[in-house]
């Protein structure tokens, strides 16, 4: 099973529409997971024409988008439990993890929180940071596909293949507009 992992599209605030390169590269996938900051339900409509979409709300999603989505999802596919959550945490936690390296103590706390919020997940897909990563932490595979609407000049998505083994690849987009 092939799943496109997308996050942080920020349409129409940062992009007017999904990049053609992205849309061409995800044709034929079995499912699409969007890890939040969609900001326009039209994004989900476009993606749903390609494959079934599972999406979660992000911190930038307006009420009309957020009200249609869960904060997190636990999905069973091909014998794997996949957690999907944007990654923003309650403000009262006061964690300074934005901009921190993924191997920092602040991110260690973030990974602990995400694991607790998505119990039983073997794979956790998240967004929010606009920085891609594929890493294992305490037996859980964490994947941030990066942002489709990048603020740092690079944009990307990821492809996850599930079967007897799990394979994931970050795919850079040549243009973020």
Predicted segments — roles?
Residues 5-17, 24-25, 33, 38-141:
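Conserved catalytic scaffold of divalent metal-dependent phosphoesterases
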Residues 6, 15, 76-78, 136-138, ...:
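Binuclear metal-dependent phosphoesterase catalytic core
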């Amino acid at each position: 099973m092939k799943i496109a992992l997308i996050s942080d599209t920020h349409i129409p605030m940062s992009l007017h529409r999904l990049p053609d390169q992205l849309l061409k590269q995800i044709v034929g996938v079995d499912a699409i997971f969007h890890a939040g900051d969609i900001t326009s339900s039209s994004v989900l409509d476009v993606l749903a024409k390609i494959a079934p979409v599972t999406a979660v709300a992000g911190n930038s999603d307006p009420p009309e988008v957020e009200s249609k989505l869960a904060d997190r999802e636990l999905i069973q596919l091909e014998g794997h439990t996949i957690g999907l959550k944007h990654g923003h945490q309650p403000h009262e936690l006061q964690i300074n993890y934005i901009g921190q390296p993924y191997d920092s103590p602040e991110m260690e706390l973030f990974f602990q929180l995400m694991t607790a919020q998505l119990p039983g997940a073997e794979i956790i897909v998240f967004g929010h940071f606009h920085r891609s990563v594929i890493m294992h932490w305490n037996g859980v595979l964490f994947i941030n596909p990066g942002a489709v609407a990048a603020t740092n000049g690079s944009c990307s998505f990821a492809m996850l293949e599930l079967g007897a083994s799990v394979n994931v690849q970050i795919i850079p987009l040549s243009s973020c507009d």
